[in-house]
């Protein structure tokens, strides 16, 4: 997979806004969207923004990342991209997500779980940066990490920056279990050669596949 430029908050890592590490007992853990908001949305100001998200993309007060970015000063949110279940979570598991218009914002919604699962050049032509904000669960069969990988591929091909708004892995970072996918069995629920429980946040996972070039076509 062609490498992509992933914007950073920490100078030490190549991903945007991993959750803030709690330095003292009881310190609040902040999801990436809150870190971005505290920075004044600086890396998005003046850019045309696309957003891959679903109902799990919220702040600690359950405000949707869609609504936060849509109303953010200086940010021009121009398109939404719907993974499995859609951006508002109104499609059943495995159901086809269609291109539509978001009722709350009037923004176009491009389906990433219908006729195609990888954004087409046409879907990306009006954006300067792609933001990804979905809560991961830490297991390989979660289709959203496959969507993330395909979004990264498509954006790399078009020279579009990707911002991953990170969130904690609910299974933690110390538990890694399960076998790798065997050759011939890669699919949208097993797209990468990683253990079933892989012990990374979605931001760390994005960095990992970016640096390792892991896409299912290149794995032997």
Regions found by a protein language model. Name each.
Residues 89-93, 163-186:
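Glycine-rich, charge-decorated loop segments at or immediately adjacent to ligand/cofactor-binding or catalytic sites
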Residues 8-18:
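Bacterial N-terminal signal peptides
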Residues 28-75:
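N-terminal phosphate-binding or glycine-rich loops at protein starts, especially the Walker A/P-loop
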Residues 136-148:
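Glycine/threonine-rich flexible loop motifs
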Residues 182-202:
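Acidic, His- and aromatic-enriched active-site or binding-groove loops in soluble protein domains
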Residues 219-220:
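Conserved small/polar residues in nucleotide/adenosyl-binding loops
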Residues 97-127, 139:
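Glycine-rich oxoanion-binding loops at beta->alpha junctions
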Residues 76-85:
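Short internal beta-strands
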């Amino acid at each position: 997979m062609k490498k992509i430029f992933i914007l950073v908050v920490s100078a030490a890592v190549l991903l945007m806004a991993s959750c803030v590490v709690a330095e003292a007992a009881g310190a609040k853990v902040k999801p990436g969207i809150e870190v971005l908001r505290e920075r004044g949305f600086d890396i998005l100001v003046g850019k045309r923004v696309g957003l891959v998200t679903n109902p799990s993309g919220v702040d600690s007060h359950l405000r949707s990342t869609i609504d936060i970015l849509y109303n953010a000063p200086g940010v021009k949110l121009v398109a939404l991209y719907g993974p499995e279940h859609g951006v508002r979570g109104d499609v059943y598991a495995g159901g086809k997500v269609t291109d539509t218009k978001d009722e709350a914002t009037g923004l176009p919604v491009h389906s990433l779980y219908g006729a195609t699962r990888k954004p087409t050049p046409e879907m990306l032509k009006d954006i300067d940066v792609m933001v990804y904000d979905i809560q991961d669960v830490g297991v390989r069969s979660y289709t959203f990490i496959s969507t993330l990988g395909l979004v990264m591929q498509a954006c790399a091909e078009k020279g579009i920056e990707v911002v991953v708004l990170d969130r904690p892995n609910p299974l933690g970072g110390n538990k890694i279990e399960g076998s790798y996918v065997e050759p011939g069995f890669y699919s949208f629920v097993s797209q990468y050669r990683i253990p079933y429980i892989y012990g990374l946040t979605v931001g760390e996972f994005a960095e990992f596949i970016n640096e390792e070039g892991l896409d299912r076509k290149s794995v032997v």
